[in-house]
Amino acid sequence: YKKADETRRKFHLLLWNVYNFFITYANVDGWDSKMQNEKLKMKNENVLDKWILSKLNQLIATVTSSLEKYDAMAASLAIEAFVTDLSQWYIRRSRDRVGPTVDASLDKDACYKTLYEVLVVLCKLLAPFTPFLAEEIYRNLTGGESVHLESWPVAENNMINKDIERQMDLA
């Protein structure tokens, strides 16, 4: 039971808190991914957004490669490390970019867009490991039928930026 409780505390609750942060502030601000089509195409200039999107694409590549080798442990550990970075680095440093006290801006929209994209893709990667949690978050975010009916994500190598990742590792 101790291992299960530790996993719940260190991973499931952390992921749920990231999701809760996003939906709370996005709802308060009236942000809706379906209404953001033009804004979603904007070039993202924020280094935090570039960093987490780089990490996300690296995660897609790592999880895909690990699962192709039937190494579920390596894949799950990579996801766990990513969720920790997402919570302890991206969310903590992006808190002042969102919320009702922050004026509407492209940076605010970029933060919501980035977090939305990260959570949707993360649900697809999580589906083989935590199917019910991934389904709950995915359906609440997208309104889609099921995360299990979606295509597996493909890493966009042009989004992987090792320089930004190195700089963040030094921070």
Please describe what each predicted stretch is.
Residues 1-10, 68-69, 73-75, 158-168:
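Conserved phosphate-binding loops in nucleotide/dinucleotide-binding enzymes
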Residues 2-3, 7, 20-21, 27:
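Feature marking long nucleic-acid-engaging regions of large polymerase/nuclease enzymes
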Residues 12, 29-36, 43-64, 92-171:
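Acidic, turn-prone loop/beta-hairpin segments
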Residues 80:
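Aromatic-lined ligand-binding clefts that engage carbohydrates, nucleic acids, or primary amines
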